Curated annotation (Swiss-Prot):
It comes from Stenotrophomonas maltophilia (strain R551-3). Required for maturation of 30S ribosomal subunits. The lineage of its organism: Bacteria, Pseudomonadati, Pseudomonadota, Gammaproteobacteria, Lysobacterales. It is found in: Cytoplasm. InterPro entries: Ribosome_maturation_RimP, RimP_C, RimP_C_sf, RimP_N, RimP_N_sf. GO terms for cellular component: cytosol. Its main location: cytoplasm. Belongs to the RimP family. GO terms for biological process: ribosomal small subunit assembly; translation. This is Ribosome maturation factor RimP. Residues 163-196 are annotated as: Disordered.
Amino acid sequence: MSDKATDIANLLAPTVVSLGLELLGVEYLPAPGGATLRLYIDVPLAEQPERIINVDDCERVSREVSAQMDVEDPISGNYTLEVSSPGVDRPLFNLEQFGRHLGESAKVTLKLPQDNRRRLQGRIEAIDEAAGAITFIVDKAEVVVSADNIDKARIMPDWVALGLAPSKPTGPAPKRPKPKTNSSSNEPAAKKPRAE
């Protein structure tokens, strides 16, 4: 998260917690016509999977946070507030969240290049809280990334395990029949009689 997003997350987290929910993270996206402030919320880990985020939860958080933002006013100018569930391709904002998803695959964008790359995709292998680092397995090799160097990270859902993968046809593709032609020579086709 950016410094601005971190400050806003720290400001709003107690409000979200008071509603019995968890603030996973904040995205602050400035733009010339007005910024977008996106909050990702979820139910506390202890209540999952029996309870999931629903539209009513998002609306409650939106109302409470809007009122708080009007009073605290941490963003100058116009902005749009969006409150969202994390979805199956959930964003990851901190070491604790990476730790919850050990063994799963993630897409990561780095702030600064590491080994000549800013993007990586790999399995989350280990978390080192003392060093503030995450170990990924990328192309069968270990890659250790400082959490401070992560700009964005998202889980890459296993669509097959979720039962949502598109089905692949088995065997060879069926052959399409060739269009039939009435004449095998260069003679023009007979004209159809007109009904009069």
